[in-house]
Amino acid sequence: MSEKATEIANLLGPTVESLGLELLGVEYLPAPGGATLRLYIDVPLAEQPDRIINVDDCERVSREVSAQLDVEDPISGNYTLEVSSPGVDRPLFTLDQFARHVGESAKIVLKLAQDGRRRFQGQIVRIDTEAAAVVFSVDGKDVQIGFGNIDKARILPDWVALGLAPQKPNKPGPKKPGHDKKKPSNEPAAGKPRAE
């Protein structure tokens, strides 16, 4: 998270927790016409999977946080507030969140290139808490990436496990007229005499 996003997360976290929810992280996206402030919320880990985040939860957080932002005013200028569930491709904002998803695949974007790359995709192997780093298996090799160098990270959903993998058609689709692949022949059609 950016410094501004971290500041806002620290400010709003207790408000979200007071509603019985968890603030996973904040995205602050400044733009010339007005910034976007996106909050990702979820139910506490202890209540999963019995309870999931819903639209009512997002609306409650939006109302409470909006009022707090009006009073505290941490953002100058216009902005749009969005409150969202993390979704199946959930973003990861903290080392604890990476630790919850060890064994799953993720894609990450770095602030500064490492090994000539800024984008990596691989399986989360472990968290090195002493080094404040995440170890990924990328192309069969372990790669350690400092948490402070991670700009963005998202879980890659396992669509097969979710039962949402694209299905291959069992039979070919209908033929389009005029697209017959047979080559024209000078032979007469069977049973028809050739006109002389």
Swiss-Prot record:
Compartments in which it is found: Cytoplasm
Keyword Protein biosynthesis: no
GO terms classed as biological process: ribosomal small subunit assembly; translation
The UniProt record lists the keyword Cytoplasm: yes
Coarse class of the protein's main subcellular location: cytoplasm
Record key words, sorted: Cytoplasm, Ribosome biogenesis
SUPFAM superfamilies tied to this protein: YhbC-like, C-terminal domain, YhbC-like, N-terminal domain
Function: Required for maturation of 30S ribosomal subunits.
UniProt similarity note: Belongs to the RimP family.
HAMAP family, per the entry: RimP (MF_01077)
Protein name: Ribosome maturation factor RimP
